[in-house]
């Protein structure tokens, strides 16, 4: 889609200077580079560029959350993890052998973005990855709704852009549910935790409505699946009785905390509950979402097409897809 847009854009612009030597090779029928990352039987891989990229601005796009891709290790089929995608990204950069004029990485879901701070003896994987890409010659890193954009402090002299999609969320939601009334009496924005506060504050300021938030009480004495389990969600905010509620966050991982927040809002007599999240990972599947939709705890789940989404999701009655590029 990006390639088609560039081809169309350059076909319809600067027609009057096509003979200028400054615009040699400016127009082309294809801007995609033929590349691959084949693997050996042991699972090891290599990056291969099948055409020259010398002197070009190279843009590498990667979806580190696309688990639908597989490879074989000693006869066993493995699904690709974010670590595998990140390694392939570095392989393609290495295959360029420093010949590209500039290397730009477009990574919609920032690799390891949730591991952006240290609270105990643990690795700072996101900062480490950014430093590694910078050391390999990457000029710009483009991402969307980074979990914490301040992680760019790891590479203060390099380009780092994190684009947020609040306008696209509102446009998609208001088109899907046109009877939403954006005023203080009928709508409220809720942050599911303290980390998403800045998103909720922006939404509420733009719409001119009130905001509430939940904070998580955790059991710090135990670790389950790499994190301290949530004991309860406590709500801070005005009365939600009869109001439609929009819950905003950067991602749905398992969805457990998001669904618990939606349930608590309905128990507080909220009207309809809409979930807006940039990345729908759905790591525990859709059974719980189906159940909560049937019980009326959630009405819509709006997520972007910035990461891979399984085909079964498109059949869900509560699902609303947000296109961050021109829709087909």
Question: Where on the chain are the PLM-derived regions?
Answer:
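Glycine-rich anion/phosphate-binding loops
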Residues: 36-41, 76-94, 120-128
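Short, glycine/charge-rich flexible loops or terminal/linker lids adjacent to PRPP-binding catalytic cores
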Residues: 16-53, 112-122, 161-174, 181-185, ...
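Conserved small/polar residues in nucleotide/adenosyl-binding loops
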Residues: 323-328
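Anion-binding alpha/beta catalytic cores of soluble intermediary-metabolism enzymes, centered on
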Residues: 119-181
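Mobile, glycine- and charge-enriched loop segments
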Residues: 55-58, 62-64, 68-72, 90-116, ...
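Short, polar loop motifs at secondary-structure junctions
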Residues: 146-149, 196, 304-309
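Residues at the starts of beta-strands that form the adenosine-phosphate
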Residues: 57, 101-104, 139-140, 186, ...
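A short, conserved beta-to-alpha structural element at the edge of catalytic cores
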Residues: 109, 216, 222-225, 263-297, ...
